[in-house]
Amino acid sequence: MIIIVTGTPGVGKTIASKKLSEALNLNYLSLSQFVIENKLYTEYDELRQSYIIDEDKVKEELEKIISTSHLVIETIYPSLVSTADLVVVLRKNPFSLYNELKGRGWADIKVAENVEAEILGVISQEAREAFKDKVCEVDTTEMSTEQILNKILNKQCDGPIEWLVDTKVQRFLEELDKIISSYENDI
């Protein structure tokens, strides 16, 4: 059994994935840690304080593990995983997510890009394109880890979630675009 838990940074992937793996007695794999530990990246992006992954190498190495394991895989890149029985996309209200990421001390550009990705549903769309009806979206806003875990275990999906129906979110997206645009010379 392969379960992918995905979503933008700050939505609760790590703790939910670990709890899910414990509840189902499956191994846990953080794809980010896997990439770093196995040097499956091409460079380090100083501006975003992130590694640029080598997608081909990641897919190749991941395939070796998937073929012999039962896993909960935590990742922001669901399409790098070749197969899954369930794909859980954790979502979070963009305003709440912004506060979460700012609280981590992240650079403004990194916060803005990740919140923009959440608003636009980038990871959700990627998951749906790769895994179609195996996707379950869960809104983690103001939920405890236990509540999130129960929703996943009971496949109580909230999605598809569309943040852009809210005019406040639309205006927020415009502000995020301004932040991102201010970094254009650095990108």
Curated annotation (Swiss-Prot):
The keyword Transferase applies. Interacts with uS11. Not a structural component of 40S pre-ribosomes, but transiently interacts with them by binding to uS11. InterPro entries: Adenyl_kinase_AK6, P-loop_NTPase. Residues 30-53 are annotated as: NMP. One of its GO terms (biological process) is ribosomal small subunit biogenesis. The keyword rRNA processing applies. Keywords: ATP-binding, Kinase, Nucleotide-binding, Ribosome biogenesis, rRNA processing, Transferase. It comes from Saccharolobus islandicus (strain L.S.2.15 / Lassen #1). It catalyses: AMP + ATP = 2 ADP; ATP + H2O = ADP + phosphate + H(+). This is Putative adenylate kinase. ATP binds at G10, G12, K13, T14, I15, R104. Residues 103-113 are annotated as: LID. It holds the Pfam family AAA_18. Its EC number is 2.7.4.3. Gene3D superfamilies: P-loop containing nucleotide triphosphate hydrolases (3.40.50.300). Belongs to the adenylate kinase family. AK6 subfamily. One of its GO terms (molecular function) is adenylate kinase activity. Disulfide bonds: none annotated. Broad-specificity nucleoside monophosphate (NMP) kinase that catalyzes the reversible transfer of the terminal phosphate group between nucleoside triphosphates and monophosphates. Also has ATPase activity. Involved in the late maturation steps of the 30S ribosomal particles, specifically 16S rRNA maturation. While NMP activity is not required for ribosome maturation, ATPase activity is. Associates transiently with small ribosomal subunit protein uS11. ATP hydrolysis breaks the interaction with uS11.
